Amino acid sequence: IKIITREKTLGKNFFFANEPGQVSFEEIDYNQTAINKALSNYDVVFNLIGILAENKKSKFKFVHTEIPRMIAKGAKINKVKSFIHLSALNINVIKDSKYALSKYNGEVELKKEFPNSVIVRPSVVFGKGDNFTIFFSNLSKFSPFLPLIGTPSIKFSKNIFKTFNFNKKVRFQPVYVGDLSKFLIKMISKKNKTYEISGPSVKSFSQIFDLILEQKKRTRIYLPLPFFIARVMAFFLELLPGPLLTRDQITLLKYDSISKKGLSNLKKVISNPLSIETVLKTYL
């Protein structure tokens, strides 16, 4: 097993239940020549590369579109038997997000090079070290407020009155990283398929915050944050290195990340997928 990365030192943070020498890390620059060489003599390739926000070194188009295309081409050249690509839920229907567009274009490009590839589109992924539950848990350490982004929903019109809907909430169907990993392994035998994947429970921001705060034994105030206010805040946060929130992420949050079909797909492989309620207490 070989793990390809741009930063080999990150391998020090991983621990594997394997014999010495069975897992190795290889540091490469992401260009076609290097990728072709790295994939030589391997039967199965997983592409798990992705970013949530752009910076000077990493742009959505390169990471989500160009790299998958190069990996798919390298897999074809090396006659790889199976190529599994990790994408994201609903990117095929979201048209106003740079993240979603780059992800979807990546799917299109890799299919041109490796038509038998398997694409997996999960909802929000949670587990030890994630960028979702851990972020809000850490935020609750020092902030008395937790943001309910997208609540209330506000409809603007020509009239002086506007519609405020506090019942409109962004919904997620989080999938446990352990279940997702098992699902990906089972995809090795599949050809030319696309699967949505989602967990067993649908949660709003406030319900996820409830679980986090209950586990950490904290009390915080939930602050309603309509999208237009969140976008203004994100604009200023983007001026900082490593922004906590971006306008493109706000755009993504306009769309629910849920899928009944996704849960059905997961249950075909994992009979009893773990819920966020069950797993959260094991790592927070």
Located regions from the model:
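A short helix-to-beta-strand connector/capping loop
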Residues: 18-25, 114-115, 218-220
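Conserved beta-loop-beta element that borders a ligand/cofactor-binding pocket
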Residues: 108-141, 145-155
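Mid/C-terminal beta-alpha module of Rossmann-like enzyme folds, strongest
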Residues: 180-246, 259-284
